[in-house]
Amino acid sequence: MIEKDFVTEGLKRTRIDEYLEKELERAGYGGMDVQITPLGTMVVVYAERPGMVIGRGGKNVRAITNTLKNDFGLDNPQIEVKEVSVPELNPKIMAYKIANMLQRGMHFRRVAYSTIRRIMGAGAQGVEVTISGKIRGSRSAVAKFVEGYIKKCGEPSIRLVEEGFATVQLKPGVLGIYVRIMPPETVLPDSVEILPPKMEIIEDDEVVEVEELDDSEEIVEEEIVEEVEDLDELEEIVEEESAEEAKEDS
């Protein structure tokens, strides 16, 4: 059945992820992707320190490739290592960092708040850190720290929020660290973008019409000025003739 194949494939991916998580913990393991290609199986490993994943002369990569082929049954596995550009935005890496700080004896509140500041400083929209276990005494408890905006339910919380989990063994018992991060480039389904108003552009035809109107008005004004000048000349001529007639009569 197809459903059974999906379950088997998902179980295999989970086992591979757990193996790489344990093997590459010191390299800052940040997750993996498995891609089936015509030439075999491509396994993309994301790590904070790719050099430790590859090893001297490619020794670690060859050992991991043989394990994936023999123990997990991958067909011609090819490993590609990619560096995590911003480790603060990778929840799996940050969960490991929290576990390491707790193992060194730091207080869980101080660890959680410092981690949240680093994640938000990297540009995340929101972050949630959950630490569960015997953190205060002999009884188990849960401490949750939230900053910014983060989706808690529905399909966007699964598709848009990245999650990471780690465990650490302390004297009182095992602590679980759960980190959820909403990346800075996340666009929510209900987000609305308000566009700026558009400026109206006057067409060339309208400009020509306005210029023609202006020219006609100038022509009319020139004709009026000429008529006024002609009237002034007539008045001067009449005044001169009347003055001459007055002289003759005298």
Curated annotation (Swiss-Prot):
Occurrences of domain KH type-2 (ranges): 16-85
An example molecular function term from Gene Ontology annotations: structural constituent of ribosome
GO cellular component, one term: cytosolic small ribosomal subunit
NCBIfam families found in the cross-reference section: PRK04191.1, uS3_euk_arch
Gene3D superfamilies (UniProt xref): 3.30.300.20, Ribosomal protein S3, C-terminal domain
GO terms classed as biological process: translation
Entry keyword Ribosomal protein: yes
Family that this chain belongs to: Belongs to the universal ribosomal protein uS3 family.
Entry-linked PANTHER family: 30S/40S RIBOSOMAL PROTEIN S3, SMALL RIBOSOMAL SUBUNIT PROTEIN US3
Lineage: Archaea, Methanobacteriati, Methanobacteriota, Methanomada group, Methanobacteria
Protein name from the UniProt record: Small ribosomal subunit protein uS3
Species per Swiss-Prot/TrEMBL record: Methanobrevibacter smithii (strain ATCC 35061 / DSM 861 / OCM 144 / PS)
Function, as annotated: Binds the lower part of the 30S subunit head.
Designated gene of the protein: rps3
Keywords: Ribonucleoprotein, Ribosomal protein, RNA-binding, rRNA-binding
Oligomeric form and interacting partners: Part of the 30S ribosomal subunit.
Annotated signal sequence range: none
Matching SMART domains: KH (SM00322)
Disulfide bonds: none
